[in-house]
Amino acid sequence: MARAAFLFKTVGFGGLQNVPINDELSSHLLRAGNSPWQLTQFLDWISLGRGLATSALVPTAGSRYYQMSCLLSGTLQIPFRPNHRWGDIRFLRLVWSAPTLDGLVVAPPQVLAQPALQAQADRVYDCDDYPFLARDPRFKHRVYQQLSAVTLLNLTGFGPISYVRVDEDMWSGDVNQLLMNYFGHTFAEIAYTLCQASANRPWEHDGTYARMTQIILSLFWLSYVGVIHQQNTYRTFYFQCNRRGDAAEVWILSCSLNHSAQIRPGNRSLFVMPTSPDWNMDVNLILSSTLTGCLCSGSQLPLIDNNSVPAVSRNIHGWTGRAGNQLHGFQVRRMVTEFCDRLRRDGVMTQAQQNQIEALADQTQQFKRDKLEAWAREDDQYNQANPNSTMFRTKPFTNAQWGRGNTGATSAAIAALI
């Protein structure tokens, strides 16, 4: 059904006393323009390059995603305070330029002279509680597209959440022809196009763009775990990965007339998220969650079960609740094995090819782990030396998260969708 509740959740602090962002990071995020709602800003923070290296301040695509979450989590607590006073207090050195939240600017001297806002962790706000958003549905949609993506990252201590749905009824109308227009394009290219379409105009619930996005997500995830491929397609479509296990996988929408999987009737869906920290370097996983955010901005998706999220994320209207859908976690490296096992069983891959892919995946994971852990150590050292200017460049994680995620069960749950 169409979305009626526009709540969003802010970031946790990861053990710090305030939002994990400082003046230097916030200035870097806004260097291209002072409005965090600009489409160029949005497409910038969901993905950078191929996700491997960017800059010292923004080392990965996941860094940009997390840092924008921190910036919005802090600055939006200004207008969402009681009485909606938007310009009388600053977050860091920033204030909103107008009550319509058009942009962020350096606070005037009289505000800079006053103490900054002490933001709170893990807060839930309703867009309709702020009059300027409540009165402008179009701008609220544009804002909520990004706040939905932020919420999908902030609901847990792991990676961003994606929605996967399989329903034959989604293929009605001109969806099949539109899919052919994307033939040969990468998942990232398709995701960018759909994000632009969502920002330009709100999607009708279960309209063409909403159905197209859900089909693209289902094709990606069914391909990601190896359920569909060139010998077992979903209505002739699948995503072909040029080099599975590589540090920068590219998934290309492809077609094959060899064999189509038999799809059971009915509507089946689930939520999935990476639990290992290397999601930070996987643009495809980030874009998948971003597309889910586009869906959330216009449609009410099924609730995520309370037992799948921490206590601070339970019973958020429109997001989590009792008897909701289970949130399935997986370890990125282990999912490569699930992918290879399926293709080998289906006769698409040899054991030697699987061994080669898995060896590459091991090297890739070690490379990513070394980088992410080095950045985390540097951030910890910086925060100890600068207690009044703390920040995290990537979402905090623990060593245990490298081994977490019931990957086999998650892979089986995705496979069971068809």
Curated annotation (Swiss-Prot):
Coiled-coil features, chain-numbered ranges: none
A cellular component annotation (GO) from this entry: viral inner capsid
Principal subcellular localization: virion
Compartment(s) of residence: Virion
Domain of life the protein comes from: Viruses
Keyword vocabulary terms for this entry: Capsid protein, Inner capsid protein, Virion
Subunit structure, interactors included: Interacts with protein mu-NS; in viral inclusions.
Functional description taken from the UniProt entry: Inner capsid (core) component.
Family membership: Belongs to the orthoreovirus sigma-1 protein family.
Protein name: Inner capsid protein sigma-2
Organism: Reovirus type 1 (strain Lang)
